[in-house]
């Protein structure tokens, strides 16, 4: 992101409004740098932000074009960790095999398949289902940067762990990863409904 001059063209180009500037209150150094806010929608990898970038800070390429981060389950916010029945993140995930359920019907994210599109975070109902508990602000599943410590944790993390280990998932289209654009790591291309 060193090439980013914070011109805002990627923000204007995003048809879903998920590319937003890092707020000053969140990070003084990264202030104004493009980041992803999945409360507005999810990314379908249309690459309009990449096309609009005049500096090449966002670029096609790399072994995995579709990689915005990785989803992490927040166990004290995820409804499935307290009650059975919520499978919204798994049901809505457009990448086959990225989210499965464990023996207790709780979501498990498989980082090797997850592309960080944010659909799971967008549709997660935990904040509204837990409105009675003011201590729960987080979604039950959130997208973090692959380089963050939270992404390196195995299984689910707590809200405290997430807050201390979360790194802003800055819009980045050229991160290294084991598989390529729209192709499931096992070889078949059943990963997306749109934009292959």
Regions picked out by a protein language model, each given a short descriptive name:
Residues 1-12:
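Mature N-terminal segment immediately following signal peptide/propeptide cleavage
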Residues 1-3, 23, 30-42, 51-196:
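Flanking helices and flexible, charged tails adjoining ferredoxin-like Fe-S electron-transfer domains
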Residues 15, 19, 24, 32, ...:
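Membrane-embedded segments
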């Amino acid at each position: 992101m060193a090439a980013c001059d914070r011109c805002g063209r990627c923000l204007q180009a995003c048809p879903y409004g998920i590319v937003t500037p890092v707020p000053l209150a969140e990070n003084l150094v990264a202030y104004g740098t493009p980041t992803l806010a999945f409360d507005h929608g999810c990314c379908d990898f249309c690459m309009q932000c990449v096309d609009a970038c005049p500096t090449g800070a966002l670029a096609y390429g790399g072994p995995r074009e579709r990689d915005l981060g990785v989803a992490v389950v927040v166990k004290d916010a995820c409804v499935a960790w307290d009650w059975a029945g919520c499978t919204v993140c798994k049901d809505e995930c457009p990448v086959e095999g990225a989210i499965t359920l464990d023996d207790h019907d709780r979501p498990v994210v498989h980082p090797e398949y997850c592309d960080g599109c944010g659909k799971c975070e967008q549709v997660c109902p935990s904040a509204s289902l837990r409105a009675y508990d003011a201590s729960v602000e987080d979604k039950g599943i959130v997208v973090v940067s692959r380089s963050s410590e939270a992404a390196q944790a195995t299984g689910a993390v707590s809200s405290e762990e997430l807050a201390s280990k979360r790194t802003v998932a800055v819009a980045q289209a050229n991160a290294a990863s084991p598989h390529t654009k729209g192709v499931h790591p096992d070889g078949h291309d059943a990963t997306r409904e749109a934009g292959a």
